[in-house]
Curated annotation (Swiss-Prot):
Species per Swiss-Prot/TrEMBL record: Archaeoglobus fulgidus (strain ATCC 49558 / DSM 4304 / JCM 9628 / NBRC 100126 / VC-16)
Domain KH type-2, chain residue ranges per copy: 17-85
Listed GO biological process terms: translation
Listed PROSITE patterns: KH_TYPE_2
Function of the molecule: Binds the lower part of the 30S subunit head.
Alphabetical UniProt keywords: Ribonucleoprotein, Ribosomal protein, RNA-binding, rRNA-binding
Location of region: Disordered: 202-229
Classification lineage: Archaea, Methanobacteriati, Methanobacteriota, Archaeoglobi, Archaeoglobales
Stored SMART domains: KH (SM00322)
Matching PANTHER family: 30S/40S RIBOSOMAL PROTEIN S3, SMALL RIBOSOMAL SUBUNIT PROTEIN US3
Listed name of the protein: Small ribosomal subunit protein uS3
Superkingdom assignment: Archaea
Length: 229
């Protein structure tokens, strides 16, 4: 049980660190975080839309983040910041930006379709956006925006679909924003390619095969006649 408890504690600590970092770099466009333990310490890589806001003037903000991570029990944290190369294919970043737009007063339906159009125009194979909560009244509900192909079950839903989630704090309450994206470079299990076939080339190969068979049969017949003589 001690081993299982240790793994649970490590996962819980990573989750707490991720949620704290998400709140700290919210204005920079949070796109995810990788936490990797190495022999020299713990490598923490932040993926954001605007790295300059995370680094700060003279690197002061990133130094403050590094010191704060030590309070979570992370040994010798080494923080690096990477810019998200293709924001439209990063589901976590899209969820964060959509949540910030809702907090600024965007109407939920306008925001949902705007981000759906942006993601699909970038070349995504499919996108699904869900906004849940008290959208227009005291009664909570869920509004869904879908385009293209989205997989919900099986291994493809886990390995091929980018997922992101964030919250928007409104006067009526908290809205949950969920984004699922299938990038354009993903090959789905039901996709296949029909290659062009050169019919003349196949006919030529077929003729050569028949000719070879005829030569072999002729040679066998001559050998049989020679043996009979």
């Amino acid at each position: 049980m001690a081993v299982e408890r240790k793994f649970v504690q490590e996962r819980l600590k990573k989750l707490m660190v991720k949620e704290w970092i998400k709140d700290e770099v919210r204005s920079a466009g949070f796109g995810g975080v990788d936490i990797l333990r190495t022999p020299l310490g713990t490598q923490v890589t932040l993926f954001v839309e605007r790295p300059g806001l995370v680094i700060g003037k003279g690197g002061r903000r990133i130094k403050a983040l590094t010191e704060k991570l030590k309070d979570f029990g992370i040994e010798n944290p080494q923080v690096s910041v990477d810019e998200v190369e293709k924001p439209e294919f990063n589901a976590q970043l899209m969820a964060s930006l959509l949540a910030r737009a809702l907090e600024r007063g965007w109407y939920f339906r306008r925001a949902g379709y705007r981000f759906l159009y942006r993601i699909m125009e970038a070349g995504a194979k499919g996108c699904e956006i869900e906004i849940s909560g008290k959208l227009v009244s005291e009664r909570a509900r869920t509004e869904k925006f879908v385009a293209g192909t989205i997989v919900h079950t099986g291994d493809p839903a886990e390995s091929m679909v980018q997922k992101g989630f964030d919250i928007a704090i409104k006067k009526l309450g908290v809205l949950g924003v969920s984004v699922r994206i299938i990038p354009p470079d993903v090959t789905l299990p039901d996709e296949f390619e029909v290659k062009d076939v050169n019919i003349e080339h196949l006919r030529g190969e077929s003729g050569e095969d028949e000719g070879d068979k005829g030569d072999e049969q002729g040679g066998e017949a001559q050998e049989a006649e020679g043996a009979g003589a």
